[in-house]
Amino acid sequence: MMQRDDLTFRYAHKEEAALLHEYDSRIFGDSWSEKSYLGSIFSSTELVPVAADTETGEIAAFAAVSYVLDEANINRIAVIPEFRGRGIGTSLLEWIEENIPDEVTEINLEVRESNKYAIEMYKNFGYTVLGRRKKFYRNPEEDALLMTKRKVDR
């Protein structure tokens, strides 16, 4: 069970959609809108988990996950720059896997080919490279590696 004294893991609140959009804009070249985050927060087939600093309540990392039947896709996962280097992304991914609906047996994600740290983290969690999506990312343009984990360990 994922536990850290310095972080609280929970789902995003509707009041945080604008802040998530702001963080998203700082981190990704192709950011999601506030409306997109609101839609995900209220969706019955999407999750928007966050890792918040236990003392301050400040969001340290966030993700956006969608699922249909037995398959999930991690659409976003990011650590706020000032919180990087503390294993927070790893902890959030572990929390996601522990809290994803029981019927999910496969998780997919795309990752920038240049994001070696994230690729290594995913491999350590048992994800494998399934393929490549040419020119998937913009700003800057880059290929994505499609990674998958066939069975979520419970």
Describe the predicted segments one by one.
Residues 77-94, 112-120, 124-125:
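Conserved glycine-rich acetyl-CoA-binding loop
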Residues 45, 70, 115, 137-143:
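Short acidic/glycine-enriched loop/turn segments that link adjacent beta-strands
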Residues 2-4, 11-82, 93-99, 150-154:
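Acetyl-CoA-dependent GNAT
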Residues 70, 105, 128:
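Short acidic/polar active-site loop segments enriched in Thr and Asp
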Residues 93, 99-110:
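Conserved GNAT acetyl-CoA-binding A-motif
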Residues 108-110, 123, 128-145:
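Conserved catalytic-core motifs of GNAT/GCN5-like acyltransferases
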Residues 72, 86, 145:
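Glycine-centered loop/turn positions within well-structured domains
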